[in-house]
Curated annotation (Swiss-Prot):
SUPFAM superfamilies from the UniProt entry: omega toxin-like
Organism phylogeny: Eukaryota, Metazoa, Ecdysozoa, Arthropoda, Chelicerata
Family: Belongs to the neurotoxin 10 (Hwtx-1) family. 54 (ProTx-1) subfamily.
Domain notes: The presence of a 'disulfide through disulfide knot' structurally defines this protein as a knottin.
Domain of life: Eukaryota
InterPro entries: Huwentoxin-1
Pfam families membership: Toxin_12
Cystine residue pairs: 2-16, 9-21, 15-28
Tissue specificity of this protein: Expressed by the venom gland.
CC per GO annotation: extracellular region
Additional remarks: Negative results: does not show activity on voltage-gated potassium channels (Kv).
Record PTM text: C-terminal amidation is important for the high potency of the toxin.
Name assigned to this protein: Mu-theraphotoxin-Df1a
Length: 34
């Protein structure tokens, strides 16, 4: 199960496709890929 946009990604949870965990805020943000 992946984390959607702006979903919390602390604790080793992985973000969904084209998303990356923001190190400072600890939520999933777009990685600028398509």
């Amino acid at each position: 199960e992946c984390r959607w946009f702006l979903g919390g990604c602390s604790g080793g949870q992985t973000c969904c496709e084209h998303l990356v965990c923001h190190r400072k805020h600890q939520w999933c943000v777009w990685d600028w890929s398509f």
